């Protein structure tokens, strides 16, 4: 029996852990600290699926009817 992956479900947007260079650019652009971003618990099923650890920032790429793609950033907490 194969394991179900959350990332394969059509209603779950794409999630990826950001690298430090891209993160620095985003934080500078929005003039925020990583701790000011919306939170994502490390125990959240999607965080477990992608292997996120406390302190990581996850970029969520959502499909949007008006914008095509909408980017969203979440700070992983313990």
Curated annotation (Swiss-Prot):
One term of GO molecular function: DNA binding
InterPro entries in alphabetical order: Arch_Rpo5/euc_Rpb5, RNA_pol_subH/Rpb5_C, RPB5-like_sf
Highest taxon of source: Archaea
The reaction(s) this protein catalyses: RNA(n) + a ribonucleoside 5'-triphosphate = RNA(n+1) + diphosphate
EC number: 2.7.7.6
Compartment(s): Cytoplasm
Keyword Cytoplasm: yes
One Pfam family in the UniProt entry: RNA_pol_Rpb5_C
Alphabetical keyword list: Cytoplasm, DNA-directed RNA polymerase, Nucleotidyltransferase, Transcription, Transferase
Gene Ontology CC terms, in alphabetical order: cytoplasm; DNA-directed RNA polymerase complex
Biological processes per GO annotation: transcription by RNA polymerase II; transcription elongation by RNA polymerase I; tRNA transcription by RNA polymerase III
Entry keyword annotation includes Endoplasmic reticulum: no
Subunit structure: Part of the RNA polymerase complex.
Family: Belongs to the archaeal Rpo5/eukaryotic RPB5 RNA polymerase subunit family.
Function: DNA-dependent RNA polymerase (RNAP) catalyzes the transcription of DNA into RNA using the four ribonucleoside triphosphates as substrates.
The protein, known as: DNA-directed RNA polymerase subunit Rpo5
Species whose genome carries this gene: Methanococcoides burtonii (strain DSM 6242 / NBRC 107633 / OCM 468 / ACE-M)
């Amino acid at each position: 029996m194969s394991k179900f992956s959350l990332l394969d479900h059509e209603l779950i947007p794409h999630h990826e852990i950001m690298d430090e260079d891209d993160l620095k650019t985003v934080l500078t652009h929005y003039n925020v600290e990583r701790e000011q971003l919306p939170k994502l618990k490390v125990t959240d099923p999607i965080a477990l699926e992608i292997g996120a650890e406390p302190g990581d920032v996850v970029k969520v790429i959502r499909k949007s009817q008006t914008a095509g793609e909408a980017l969203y950033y979440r700070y992983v907490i313990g």
